[in-house]
UniProtKB/Swiss-Prot annotation:
It is an enzyme of class 6 (ligase). GO terms for molecular function: ATP binding; phosphoribosylamine-glycine ligase activity; phosphoribosylformylglycinamidine cyclo-ligase activity. Keywords: ATP-binding, Cytoplasm, Ligase, Nucleotide-binding, Purine biosynthesis. It comes from the Bacteria. Pathway: Purine metabolism; IMP biosynthesis via de novo pathway; 5-amino-1-(5-phospho-D-ribosyl)imidazole from N(2)-formyl-N(1)-(5-phospho-D-ribosyl)glycinamide: step 2/2. One of its GO terms (cellular component) is cytosol. PANTHER family: TRIFUNCTIONAL PURINE BIOSYNTHETIC PROTEIN ADENOSINE-3 (PTHR10520:SF12), TRIFUNCTIONAL PURINE BIOSYNTHETIC PROTEIN ADENOSINE-3-RELATED (PTHR10520). Pfam families: AIRS, AIRS_C. HAMAP family: AIRS. This is Phosphoribosylformylglycinamidine cyclo-ligase.
């Protein structure tokens, strides 16, 4: 008679999954909003739309962290990639004026390492807490043979809400409007395949002091900045015509996503100083300037477009919220089929 097999024999530890759920419950609980009905662990999560909305529109977004995870594996640094995961989605839905309501995560691995997964999800909860977004659930998938030992993949899903009349579409953007840029916290979560290639080729001392007391390793792995609270506060006071979250495609490819087809964002390359991380990447990788602008955020994580008469006040307000804000340039009429972002 053959030996009796269990799920554990096949490589799946149900007890480990249960242990993880118990460990992360306190972190998730800190993120809860009054709109959330019920506790973590049900088959579905219930969220009601607040009564303050007359005609609410739900805005959804999903994203991952990309190959930045490879550095997390190599450097055994797992406590901030969860922040990256949240930021990539909530910053995206913020662009349309949405207040993030809730977030779900997907964590997949070959064998569940409970302490490591706890670090990751603790970071997710921190990102949710910092953006006022409830972590209402997720999926932990342990799939033997699907991932190398010690590796995992992440996906995040955010849903927010905005009053229909307040949805930011970019349609009102016109010549003469001002382009503001909010500083990034590093490379955020994009361009890491190139970053890893540069590190591999240049073989730098990752633990030597690099910038303002930070090592190069710390500068490279720094988490994506969350812009939710300062931008939502600004929207209470000012009209923002358009925003662009600077992610994959860099400055040149993301700004046009919010511009009317007959306009161009004319950006002055000298309006902000390229942060040291990007200076190093460009030099060590011999990366052409235009390639830098279409691969990395180059120090600008969020672009905000406002009327000229509001520019100084918005800049001052966001600075007061703790953001470093640059006046990058202006919107002008487009000539023929020229690219809609011109950096010069």
């Amino acid at each position: 008679m053959s030996t009796s097999l269990s799920y554990r024999d096949a490589g799946v530890g149900i007890d480990a999954g249960d242990q993880l759920v118990e460990k992360i419950k306190p972190f998730a609980k800190r993120t809860m909003r009054p709109e959330v009905l019920g506790d973590l662990g049900g088959f579905g999560a219930l969220v009601e739309i607040g009564k303050k909305y007359q005609n609410p529109v739900l805005v959804s977004g999903t994203d991952g962290v990309g190959t930045k995870l490879k550095l997390a594996f190599d450097w055994d640094k797992h406590d901030t990639v969860g922040i990256d995961l949240v930021a990539m989605s909530v910053n995206d839905i913020l662009v349309q004026g949405a207040e993030p309501l809730f977030f779900l995560d997907y964590f997949a691995c070959g064998k569940l390492d409970v302490p490591r997964a706890t670090d990751v999800i603790k970071g997710i909860a921190q990102g949710c807490e910092e953006s006022g977004c409830a972590l209402i659930g997720g999926e932990t998938a342990e799939m033997p043979g699907m991932y190398p030992v010690g590796e995992y993949d992440l996906a995040g899903f955010a849903v927010g809400v905005v009053e229909k009349e307040n949805v930011i579409t970019g349609l009102s953007i016109g010549a003469g409007d001002v382009v503001l840029g909010l500083a990034s916290n590093g490379a955020h979560s994009n361009g890491y395949s190139l970053i890893r290639k540069i590190i591999e080729r240049d073989n730098p001392d990752l633990d030597a002091e690099f910038d303002n007391g930070k090592t190069l390793r710390e500068a490279v792995i720094a988490p994506t900045r969350l812009y939710v609270k300062p931008i939502l506060a600004a929207l209470e006071k000012f009209t923002i015509k358009g925003m662009a979250h600077i992610t994959g495609g860099g400055i040149t490819e993301n700004v046009p996503r919010v511009l009317p087809k007959n306009t161009v964002a004319q950006i002055d390359a000298e309006s902000w100083e390229l942060p040291k991380l990007f200076q190093w990447l460009q030099k060590a990788g011999n990366v052409e300037t235009q390639e830098m602008y279409r691969t990395f955020n180059c120090g600008i994580g969020m672009v905000v477009i406002v009327a000229a008469e509001d520019a100084d006040a918005v800049r001052s307000f966001l600075s007061g919220q703790g953001e470093t804000v640059y006046r990058l340039g202006c919107i002008r009429e487009r000539q023929g089929n020229e690219h809609q972002t011109q950096v010069a």
